[in-house]
């Protein structure tokens, strides 16, 4: 994919859309592109508790997106490539990590249907920091997924949705276990009032780890909750239920989140207990807390902060905390600057470590064309 030019991607995309769409439908095509370029300093990329060694990373991530709208259908694709160079390749290798998203969605009076395919390659230093805490080796994680979703308005107040996904994750380097999952989720929502919408949710996942002698595990989630619009600025969603693992029995799960939108600022947060697939070769139970804050200083500048905490209960118990702050400014109509400061802390069975990251990124945004 990285060897194809943007013009070739566009031509193939538009041709596919024209073949599928009806000749009577007017086709509108939109394109966008951006090139973020930056440098960051990481004081402890290996998250070592005894031998901290710092590096400089030089990063460029060209992105291209295209979408086509015809009547009630929309096709879209997003492609990016993260190019990373390190000042010390013993600590952090040079990387070329692609990310591809291709999707289609269609609406009718009562139904909505969508298909989406994804491919993503990334460093396990980022993917496993929260997931398992295994970040010593700079390995690679490659994830491929295909998902389909359908929703329907059964009555004026009752809505039903059904979704399925097939996902595979593989690793190169490190002591990680690749796996595949097949999942099915359904949700029934009732519009009780204009502000309160209770729901029931059921989720089934089949987990198959790679390697001989490893057994597959089945997970079942049953949740009851409600979406509540407290006022035009604040909405809250809360749910609680039971998870059943074929290998471990029953456990409790829950999720609460909120969003507040002020005149110049926004707040968001979530608190969750979940059971999910992981690279340790099985499901793991996790408790998570995340908070976010954004503030518009002016029409051209803004700042924000994010905090996350996660505790994993599995074969490799770990606890991670991360606090980030940023400042961004629109330098011109097409150029943007972003400053980032971040501190991280990781505790696991055999370590307790911390590290800091400081970086600056300049982004050139190519407008719609």
Predicted features along the sequence, with ranges:
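Cleavable N-terminal export/targeting peptides
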Residues: 1-30, 367-369
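Gram-negative and organellar
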Residues: 26-369
